[in-house]
Structure formats: C-alpha cells, structure tokens
C-alpha cells in the first residue's frame, strides 16, 4: 500500500485529508509540526510527502530542504501561499508539485497519482533475484 506522510498543523484539515486519501486506497500518517514531520520521515518509509509551508517549529521550506539532503521521495507542497515567488522557491528546493489551498479533492488525488507514476521503475522495484 502506498504510504503518504502529511505534514500539516491544522488538525481538521489533516483529518479530512487523511480520510480522503484513505478512501482512495492510500495509507497516511500525520505530523503536526516540521520537527515531528522530519522525525516521522526518518523513522518510517513513505512513498510521498504532502507538506504545508506554514507549520510550527521548522518551516515547510526547511523540512523540504532537510528531506532532500537524504531522499528523492516525491514532495507535494500543499499550502495557502500562492504567490509566484513561493511556488518557484518551493519547486527549486525540490518539491515535485505545488498545490494551493483551497484545492479540489479530485485534482489533488490526480496530482498525487501523477507524481507517483513519474517515480522511476528502479526506485519502486525491489530486487528479488
């Protein structure tokens, strides 16, 4: 099952997002701060990270930077920050997509599936020889 880490400090939002994604067949884990998100990422394996930019303790930008030092797991920034500068910075730091709130649930699920499809075959396969 595809595992998604949601790093989002608004509990009602993260609960609704988890419900939506679990209904679509994904397994989710939620972290409410940047620090907790990095800790969760380091202790478990995830196929994708949904990352809010405005989170406590460590900013979403710094979380993205930290994850990128050790992993190429897909990151989708999911945030209310919708300026062109924010989008460009997020993508240049290594985000694979950038979705602004409010968003369409159908569009978000489609973007998640598209990013996961783009993963390289050697990244998603395990050697069973």
Predicted regions and their residues:
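N-terminal/domain-start alpha-helical segments
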Residues: 1-123
């Amino acid at each position: 099952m595809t595992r998604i880490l949601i790093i989002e400090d608004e509990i009602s939002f993260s609960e609704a997002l988890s419900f939506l994604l679990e209904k679509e067949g994904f397994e989710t884990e939620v972290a409410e701060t940047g620090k907790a998100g990095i800790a969760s990422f380091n202790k478990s394996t995830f196929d994708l990270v949904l990352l809010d930019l405005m989170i406590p303790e460590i900013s979403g930008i710094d979380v993205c930077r930290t994850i990128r030092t050790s992993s190429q797991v897909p990151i989708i920034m999911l945030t209310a920050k919708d300026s062109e500068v924010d989008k460009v910075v997020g993508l240049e730091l290594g985000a694979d997509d950038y979705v602004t709130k409010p968003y369409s649930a159908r569009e978000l699920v489609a973007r998640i599936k598209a990013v996961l499809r783009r993963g390289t075959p050697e990244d998603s396969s395990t050697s069973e020889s």
